[in-house]
Design a protein with these regions (language model features):
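Eukaryote-specific detector of the first structured module of a protein
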Residues: 1, 11-14
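Generic alpha-helical secondary-structure signal
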Residues: 3, 22, 41-45
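Amphipathic alpha-helical repeat scaffolds
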Residues: 5-9
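Short, well-ordered alpha-helical segments enriched in acidic and aromatic residues
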Residues: 13-26, 30
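A short gly/proline-enriched turn/hairpin at secondary-structure junctions
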Residues: 26-37, 49-54
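A beta-strand edge to alpha-helix "cap/lid" segment located at domain peripheries
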Residues: 44-139
């Protein structure tokens, strides 16, 4: 199993019920300033998140790992449905802790949004997010 890309793939479909299958029943989440414990709360958190974040394009890179823990760096772009559909990019880090069965038991995300001007988008239609050169300034 590719633990870095599997969550990316399930998120791309934006189906909270499918996403939570990768998490333990009592998984603990922090997503920015929101906290969730267990599948029902995670589904609620994801539903609200994706009501806000439209046309979501995500890229994650392995940052480091040790035993049952992984950290990833990510960038994603979206249109903010709660802010006039402005394009934004989120820069952030996540740390994940896995159970012995391979499901994630803890996920913590810290991210910062930057409003994008015309022409600033990286993850445009017709181009894979993996093709985008992300310069040192953004690493």
């Amino acid at each position: 199993m590719n633990k870095t890309n599997d969550p990316v793939d399930s998120v791309a479909h934006r189906e909270p019920q499918a996403v939570v299958k990768a998490y333990s029943e009592n998984s603990i989440w922090r997503n920015r300033d929101q906290f969730a414990v267990g599948h029902a709360e995670i589904v609620e958190l994801l539903t609200k998140k994706w009501e806000k974040e439209k046309d979501y394009r995500l890229r994650k890179e392995l940052f480091c790992w040790h035993d049952e823990k992984i950290a990833v760096q990510f960038w994603y772009e979206y249109r903010d449905a709660l802010d006039g559909m402005k394009w934004k990019r989120c820069y952030g880090l996540e740390d994940w802790t896995f159970d012995v069965d391979g499901r994630m038991r803890k996920r913590q995300m810290s991210g910062n949004d930057v409003e994008l001007k015309d022409g600033d988008r990286w993850f445009v239609e017709g181009k894979s997010v993996e093709e985008v050169e992300i310069g040192d300034k953004h690493w």
